[in-house]
Amino acid sequence: MHRFLAFAILIGGVARAETVLTLPFFNHADSANLDWVGESIAESVRDALASEGVLVLDREDRLEACRRLSLRPGAELTHASVFKIGDSLDASKVVYGFYELLPVEPGKNQSKGSLRITARILDLKRTLQGAPFSEIGALEDLASLEYRLGWQVLQQLNWKNLPTQEDFLQAHPPVRLDAVESYVRGLLATSSEQRHLFFTRAARLDEHYSQPCFQLGKTYWERKEYKIAAGWLERVTRGDPHYLEAQFFLGLCRYNAADFSGAEQCFRTVAAEVPLNEVFNDLGAAQARRNDSQAAIASFQKALDGDSADPDYHFNLGYTLWRSGKFAGAVESLRAVLQRSPNDAEATSLLGRALKQEGPRPGDPRSEARERLKTNYEEAAYRQLQAELGK
């Protein structure tokens, strides 16, 4: 993803949009049992920034950069290493820091102690390290601490339309500590079985915790267990940075479960905010399966307008035109498929029937449900491009 964006910026001749990288915070708590907290802070701050529209690099981008630079996960990084990671990802700013556990105050034996999180922002454009700022509170209130820190980061970035801290925290309700720990341990797990175990535990410990639901939904989607995946994806809340991606995959799950009306609703929700070609394509497929050919043709045309090089968009448009008896348009679209993909046997067969003005035969499986779906979702690429274009 990141390499694709860098290439797009280079050939487009537009200014690179400002992006922020959040690194795991370093453990100064003298307890290896709290190593997971550093990853939790990074993820929560990232989610907090993303929820306000900041372009934030993905965890996968950061892990890949560390691999390329041969940096050991979990190790405390030098200032030079922090700079190298950010620079390798073309980040504008890097958020990083450390946390420490303070002794339990007398009379508060039920407390796990207080956590002090200290953060800094490194401005890579000006090679300037900002002054440290911190949040302190009970370890049990880690989620709230992290979101308060996220609000401070937004403040330090001079983010436009910054909500009040009260409104910001209302939009990010607290999560149980044990649920947060389970979720983060799921992110850090090295096997799919461990990830599933930890994410499921996190979702059960706090039923309002959206992030593990998204992870579980994606897991079941990849296993093609669409009904179970849909159940998890439906629980991803509007305030979650993954909400629109969850809606996209929920639409695919519903489509595969033959709930075409529900799929259309999901794709419409996504298209209203992230009008990707892939989303319009899948919206058109859902509309076509509902026998709304006029709407489907319009949606497929939007996908095609965005990327005329993709043979699948030409195929879907041609196939729907053919089913609608619009043979001349179908011939044009199907020929466009074969210009881009000469070995497409299905397009060749349909083109022959369109040239003969021979429509679909009732009950013929070769004529039914031939729409081609897209399963890649590139919201980050879209948002970065919009930022670069100043929209």
What are these regions (language model features)?
Residues 18-84, 88, 92-108, 124, ...:
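Short beta-strand->alpha-helix linker/helix-N-cap micro-motif
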Residues 144-189:
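Mid-sequence helix-capping/hinge segment at a functional interface
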Residues 175-211, 215-224:
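Alpha-helical segment of the N-proximal tetratricopeptide repeat
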Residues 205, 238-239, 272-274, 306, ...:
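Structural marker of alpha-solenoid helical repeat scaffolds
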Residues 339-391:
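Terminal, low-structured helical/coil segments at or just beyond the last alpha-helical repeat
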